[in-house]
């Protein structure tokens, strides 16, 4: 590889790895939620209800679980896009399902999900508004896996023509634990 190609690859790596704080919501300051954020939070709860129903409304055949609202990839995408962006619903499907050739439909993959926020969590939330108008809600969970631990659960919602949709979910360990 020539020196020019090495330089190009190095520059691309720097651009991909070094991002501004706006691209890293965890670096931006948070504020306690106010009633002004409640409409976006209420929509977030509706989106999480879509996720919950996708997982809980299922057929069981032997020890296999099949989503009722997602026999095919297209049907599952359409269902999940009631509460999630197109790209994130695709990521959810990759994480939650696999195609079962024997039954000709999507199968749920057993595993751990993510925390589900409820209306009672509203007063425990913090938020920030991103440059594009999306809202990041954060709830901290403590003492989950071991004494003294702390995790940030962040849900980013954006407003689209069909309402507020979940764009991303992250669960990361707080950097200042131990």
Give the residues covered by each predicted segment.
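Core segments of small alpha/beta cavity-forming domains
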Residues: 32-110
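Short beta-strand edge/turn micro-motifs at domain boundaries
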Residues: 148-178
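Surface-exposed, charged secondary-structure patches
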Residues: 100-145
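Sec-dependent signal peptide cleavage junction
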Residues: 18-28
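Bacterial N-terminal signal peptides that target proteins for export
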Residues: 1-7
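Bacterial N-terminal signal peptides
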Residues: 9-17
């Amino acid at each position: 590889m020539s020196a020019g190609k090495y330089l190009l690859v190095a520059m691309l790596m720097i651009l991909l790895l070094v991002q501004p704080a706006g691209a890293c919501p965890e670096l931006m300051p948070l504020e306690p939620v106010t009633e002004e954020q409640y409409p976006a939070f209420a929509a977030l709860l509706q989106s999480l209800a879509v996720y919950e129903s996708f997982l809980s409304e299922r057929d069981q055949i032997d020890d296999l679980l099949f989503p009722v609202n997602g026999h095919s990839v297209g049907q599952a995408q359409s269902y999940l896009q009631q509460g999630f962006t197109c790209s994130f619903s695709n990521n959810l499907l990759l994480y939650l399902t696999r195609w079962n050739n024997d039954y000709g439909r999507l199968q749920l993959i057993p595993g751990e999900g993510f925390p589900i926020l409820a209306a009672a969590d509203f007063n425990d939330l913090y938020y920030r508004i991103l440059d594009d108008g999306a809202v990041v809600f954060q709830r901290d969970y403590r003492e989950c896996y071991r004494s003294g631990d702390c995790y940030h659960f962040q849900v980013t919602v954006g407003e689209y023509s069909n309402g507020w949709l979940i764009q991303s979910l992250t669960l990361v360990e707080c950097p200042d634990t131990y």
